[in-house]
Design a protein with these regions (language model features):
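Short, low-complexity disordered leader/linker segments with a strong preference
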Residues: 1-32
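Conserved residues at the C-terminal ends of beta-strands
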Residues: 20, 37, 85, 104, ...
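Early extracytoplasmic/lumenal segment of secretory-pathway proteins
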Residues: 24-91, 221
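Short beta-strand and adjacent tight-turn residues that come in two discontinuous sequence segments
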Residues: 62, 84, 215, 232-233
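A ligand-binding cleft/hinge motif common to bilobed small-molecule-binding domains
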Residues: 88-91, 224, 230-245
């Protein structure tokens, strides 16, 4: 079962120093390097792209924004296009890691709904283009929990979910958002006392032995294989999960 919670937005952006108009790696080497979340694209599409453009796609994936950021910051890899979540775009802009886009070269931007333009993480729409939007929710196995899960606070209640049973996202932004909602606070609060309270709740959840693991893509397999009672994951993946289990 799934309970819908908060929305997420993934955004395409170009790394500074990689593609510069027609002078980037795709133009000079015939290869475009893309860094994206796992399970987000059908790689068969890359063959069609190569047939139409003559440019080969070098495609790599990551499991969290933080893992992506660390790899990019190390300077050990070069990518042309990355697709992080909204909040990470702000950080990359602030640190000068993204190039401004030439929207004359992106005609399909005209098809992006107005509500997804000029977002707070890129208010002037200079560095990014929305790629996908969706919702995140609580997914649980009714045969493995003590009582039905009906609210966010249940993920922190041992009497409801048991021990070693809950899968939490392996990134601070989403974990703190979940805890804030469990406490009845806005997920975007800037109140230091509320954020501290959320962090304390997450620490207690771990100390109480409720959390089985902090993971990302592994949530799909663990829930499908009945390895965990509950997890927080993407609503679209839930539809696939119920087909498999």
């Amino acid at each position: 079962m799934v309970k819908r919670i908060f929305s997420f937005l993934c955004v395409g952006a170009i790394l500074a120093g990689m593609l510069a108009g027609c002078g980037g790696t795709a133009a000079t080497n015939g290869v475009v390097s893309v860094y994206n979340w796992g399970e987000y694209m059908d790689t068969d599409l890359f063959d069609e792209f190569t047939e139409q453009t003559g440019i080969r796609v070098n495609y790599s994936t990551y499991e969290s924004n933080e893992a992506m950021y660390t790899k990019l910051r190390s300077g050990s890899v070069n990518y042309d296009v990355i697709i992080p979540s909204d909040y990470m775009i702000s950080r990359l802009i602030d640190e000068g890691m993204l190039m401004k886009l030439d929207f004359d070269q992106i005609p399909n931007y005209a098809n992006i709904d107005e509500q997804y333009r000029n977002m707070i993480y890129d208010p002037n729409n200079e560095y990014s283009v929305p790629y996908t939007w969706g919702t995140t929710g609580i997914i649980y196995n009714p045969n493995m929990v003590q009582q039905p899960i009906t609210k966010w606070a249940d993920l922190f209640d041992e009497e409801k979910v048991g021990t070693h049973s809950v899968l939490m996202f392996d990134n601070s932004r989403d974990c703190i958002a979940i805890a804030l909602m469990a406490l009845g606070y806005d997920i975007n609060t800037t109140d230091a006392s509320q954020i501290t309270e959320a962090v304390d709740l997450l620490v207690k959840q771990k100390q109480d032995g409720i959390v089985q693991a902090y993971v990302m893509d592994q949530i799909f397999d663990k829930m499908t294989n009945n390895e965990a009672a509950a997890g927080v994951y993407y609503a679209g993946d839930y539809l696939i999960m119920v087909e498999d289990n």
